[in-house]
Amino acid sequence: HTISRRQRQMCIRDRYSPINPIDSIESAEKIILLEKIESIAKKLNPHIVKVSASLASQFDVILIKTFTGELVEDIRPLVRLSISVIVEKNQRREQGSAGGGGRYALDYFTDEVLHEYASTAVNQAIVNLDAMPAPAGSMTVVLGSGWPGILLHEAIGHGLEGDFNRKGTSAFSGKIGTKVASPEVTVVDDGTIPNRRGSLNVDDEGNTTSRTTLIENGKL
């Protein structure tokens, strides 16, 4: 199918590289990359008994037709490297894991990055060796940055999606401007941070991504 220049809307690809990460290095180099992070991890602590690592990459080329008839195209590279280690001491085994990635080519995983992931996984496992079970019951907890954001997403993220609010099935339907959280809570959805796995040039409706404040000082 031929797309006319009038129909085509080319997005500015400035939030991540258009390089296909799947082809950015040879298969043999991918194996070497995994062997390298395994070697780095094993040298960090004598109690390590097992290291597992995985490397994933994908490259999506999409074309979206908007309700106004415009055609928007985009590319979406994505890579991730994960490492898991098992340590053993005094007949007790514990595990630690780490990893990362984003919208990069595979050369993002430099020796420095590999060492950071390996160190994080090993340190986590070593701490777990002396860890005690958390007490049961209700209590105040402090969540650090990073993965705890998943809790926020699952708790309120889906309820703030447009489809549920349009249909009136969300707990937040019709509550714009009202208090829905503590005055100390502000939630921002930012799809424009360069190279982050949650960032896009355009969303699946063909709109340019932006920085959107969902909850400000407790108000929707």
Whereabouts are the PLM-identified features?
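Short, flexible active-site loop motifs that bind/organize anionic cofactors or intermediates
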Residues: H1, N20, Y104
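Flexible, glycine- and charge-enriched loops at secondary-structure boundaries
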Residues: H1, S27, D111, H115
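Single conserved hydrophobic/aromatic residue that forms the stacking wall/gate
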Residues: H1-I12
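Active-site-adjacent "lid" and substrate-binding segments of diverse enzymatic cores
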Residues: R13, I32, P46-I48, S54-L220
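Glycine-rich and small/hydrophobic secondary-structure elements
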Residues: S17-K43, G162-N165
